[in-house]
Amino acid sequence: MNHVIASPPVDAEPTYHADFAMGEHSARHLRRILRLYLKGWELLDVADAAELALTELIANVVRYVPGRRCQTFIFLLAAGGVRVEVADACPDVPRMVVGDELDEGGRGLVLVDAVTDKWGVEPRPDGRGKTVWFECLSVAGAADRAIALSDRSAAPRAPRP
């Protein structure tokens, strides 16, 4: 299971932040915004997974949060990936439920768990509601980091005086 509690660094600033009431078509607009950021960051390898996970979190807001109001944050991870957070004032914590194969809903967090590297739910710092978040890490970014680290360790070092 990918469910982990891991807050971003306190000093991390989101690249994108929106605060508004969600409608039936809000997920489509947020997916488009997310994809634009991922394209600019050269992280398109995580776009499909991140968009699906975002859609599921927004669907939960539309379905379960009174007033459908939430805040959405997008963070670029230094490790080469993206973190998306959806915060709302509803105290009810979503649960991952494996339903009957004929059920029409209830699989959102199962999908989030399947397509993300990490996800979790944590109480909001102000005590009102919760934040549901996920992280998708780029395989390409990880490979590039590994090559850079191996290049650094293989590089000749100047003798110390």
Residues covered by each model-derived region:
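Short coil/turn residues that cap or connect secondary-structure elements
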Residues: M22, L38, E42-D45, V62, ...
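Conserved short strand/loop->alpha-helix "switch" segment adjacent to the catalytic nucleotide/phosphoryl-transfer site
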Residues: R28-T55
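STAS-typified acidic loop motif
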Residues: H17-H29
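Conserved beta-strand-loop-beta-strand hairpin that lines the nucleotide-binding pocket
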Residues: M1-H17, V62-P161
